[in-house]
Swiss-Prot record:
It holds the Pfam family PTS_2-RNA. Removes the 2'-phosphate from RNA via an intermediate in which the phosphate is ADP-ribosylated by NAD followed by a presumed transesterification to release the RNA and generate ADP-ribose 1''-2''-cyclic phosphate (APPR>P). May function as an ADP-ribosylase. Belongs to the KptA/TPT1 family. This is Probable RNA 2'-phosphotransferase. One of its GO terms (biological process) is tRNA splicing, via endonucleolytic cleavage and ligation. Keywords: NAD, Transferase. One of its GO terms (molecular function) is tRNA 2'-phosphotransferase activity. The keyword Transferase applies.
Amino acid sequence: MIARNPIKQDPAMRNTQDDHSRFLSLVLRHQPETIGLQLDDQGWADIGELLARLAAKGRNLGRKQLEKIVLDNDKQRFAISEDGLRIRANQGHSIKIDLGLAACEPPDRLYHGTASRFLDAILAEGLRPGQRQHVHLSADGQTARKVGARHGKPVVLEIDARAMRQAGLAFYRSDNGVWLIDGVPPVFIRQTEAR
């Protein structure tokens, strides 16, 4: 019988880790200038420089803490390069970034979670990336429902990805499994129950 580790993470530490994760999202997805950081064309930042600039802004974060944030993030928002020297957000950028993703074949159906208050506009106008570079889609309805619940009463939309692909629209898949597309015309969208 294997004993479970009785040590639980201190809630204060969890909040600190969550706070660091949120701030990293801000810096690596939207506003690197907040700490004077420069991202390369593919969104990568030097880890040493990132940690130094965070410290200069009073956010002391060590290399091991950063790696823990990357590994523990339930949505796998961040990636560390194979050489271990750089970090980037996997998707969700509002700044111009080329993630270097190749177009790939999506499953026949993909899903998008939103709040009910946006439904009429989406069914009339389609899905647009808004301030982000891409519309984010999930491979399953349950994940989409969770995303929609963050914004209000959740609604799950089913996307006919097969028909979109046949119409020549390109899909990309980020390193953490989120499907990305420039937009979804309303003809390919229908409301559904999460599965």
